[in-house]
């Protein structure tokens, strides 16, 4: 199996200013493409640091992916470092320079002169077009090794990495299969899977997330692809409604897909999540076909005046109650004229809890023409973790309803 190293360039990474999300994405895509990632390294914006990381990785890596350091500023030094490391020339590509300047002039009146730095191309490198930003990537084939240079911003890096992998065309020795599960502990899921896997060549990797549940990756030699498919079906039989979907699917993707399949529309009334559930849904292209809208009723006055939650309910039971979420769901469903409505109200903390309703208490209601399901859950975590867990369970509740599993 071909090996790969990932080098992330940027002082903002090693100083802890920003989270290195690129590393996770690149690891996933390289593994999916059949490459074995053997190391990840983060280095400063320094030519010698970059060169040292590259030279070290050249010893045992077939592919090296570098992200960051391709901008126009003084501290963008990845191109120069690679050229020096490989002892290759680097020169200004006039045609590329004009293309970059033309792109920038569409959005800005002034085109800085230092933008020409982004048109410096390493000898014999293939240019990777950037359709989002201004910094092109480069693909360098050198003495049997492949170096992929990508910009740092994730929205630029991700499509460019996919294009680079199409150019490289690695031949995977492994067959891989990914699955997403929700509302089942990682340990329990792992126990279920390991109890039915008796082939030592089948590898199991699980990753739990408050945002999406548990993602499982099964891998085996390519010749056993059919066995992996059979294994996945057996896992689904044993986990039932906990299975969300195959591949890199998310809860929100699954919701939009199933709403379309069932020809149902959805509206949401959010309190403690502050619009997080709605935000996740609108990340999915085509969501407007089935997701009509949402009301963030964070203050009781909005619950009362917009969603028509009665004063009696708010005074007697409080905003965090089954009675309140029931009226919130019916209120938003009537306003939006949707088939289904979800309402959530909870106590995110750190204050506001009581003995009967401690911080972390949350109520959900999903309502339809002949459907009403109310649930109370308890997530005693830090505020943003609480909101992530509530948003995820809200999406899962919609899926369960649509799948007639309530």
UniProtKB/Swiss-Prot annotation:
InterPro entries in the record: CinA, CinA-like_C, CinA_C, Competence-induced_CinA, MoaB/Mog-like_dom_sf, MoaB/Mog_dom
Pfam families hit by this protein: CinA (PF02464), MoCF_biosynth (PF00994)
Similarity comment text for this entry: Belongs to the CinA family.
Name of the molecule in the record: CinA-like protein
